[in-house]
Amino acid sequence: MWLFAAAGVSSHLTSMLLHLPQAMAGAMLAGSLMLFGLFHGASTYGWRGIVFFIVVCLGVSNAFENLSILTGFPFGWYHYGDKMGPRLFLVPLLIGPLYFGVGYLSWTLARAILGDANGQLAGRLVYATPIVASFIMVCWDLTIDPKMSTITSNWIWRDGGSYFGVPVANFLGWYLTVYVFLQVFALYARRLSATPDRIPGYWAKPLLAYSSIVIAPILSLTLSSALGAVSDATGHAWQIRDIQAVTALVGFFTVLPFWLLALFRVPRPENH
């Protein structure tokens, strides 16, 4: 699991330093985070539990994404460009693994913040964990969506939006989508006999993996040499450096604090 956690960090560095194609960079990140979530999740909830998580996550996220492409709900009107590889219906295949990989990390950070040391959901944690984890995951989208849509056109918002060409509805839709699949999993997981990994590093591994999300917008700002303006689908022009600076700032004050909260709240090995 250390390997997969480290791979998540290195994939960001490699893709930015080598300017890899978006599909390749996305596949590297999605693959490393999904493998990490699979094995770390199995050590906590067993194989049946983590497979249930994956099935619900992929099913709900793909359904909501396709629904929004066709109807505008819940994210808004958009469509994917041609850079993201093969698709499941109207959604690129690598989107699902990203939902799972980042979703599982968000879930695990929420557990640490809420003091869930043993993985046994009970009482308020059944509902509090999905609520907090969904906020954590939406913070990640706040740092990537303007770049991935407005700058690189991996997906295109038909009517643009106030957040550098991204509509506010997108982030509300993200919260709804993530909350639904995490809440379904929480209701299922409370019946499981959780068996969290008791070896040293159980909490350090997801914190390392999530650090790739913490550093990504800052690296994007510092390593990119892109200048000038880009236009969204409505023709509104946005300065590339403004997008990179603001998303780095948003990440610094949203993604990083959640990571630090989890770091400070993580149960000590003797309690685990």
Question: Residues of each region from the PLM?
Answer:
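Aromatic-rich, lipid-facing transmembrane alpha helices and their immediate juxtamembrane interface loops
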Residues: 1-272
